[in-house]
């Protein structure tokens, strides 16, 4: 197997999934901060070499920053015995979550570098468990549609009986 085969889109999705699991298990700031610095550095180096525009990435990153600010706004305080107090556990959790989400976003950009939607959509079918997930999704969707039809028919029948009984 040649080395470039290991960087095919479906393998990148698998690597990204495993990396996401690793990131979600990290809780030590001495690991999260250097990994964020490394990921951002690699991202900017990749941008420099490919000569892509930073603007689309900046818009997505700004949406993440808004989410992180809202997360900090909700986790950094609590209502205690003396009214509103600082929540030090919440601040610590907000630090970890913001570093994790930032690392996940930058990692997503790096792992899916130069992959557009036309390549990404067919690549998930090459993963072994994708068929099972898609079958489950289709079965769930069918069940939803059937339940909706039954509920709408029952509602229609109930409405007809209500109309006929009131007339």
UniProtKB/Swiss-Prot annotation:
It is a multi-pass membrane protein. The chain crosses the membrane at residues 13-33, 37-57, 61-81, 103-123. This is Uncharacterized protein HI_1620. GO terms for cellular component: plasma membrane. Keywords: Cell membrane, Membrane, Transmembrane, Transmembrane helix. Its main location: membrane. It is found in: Cell membrane.
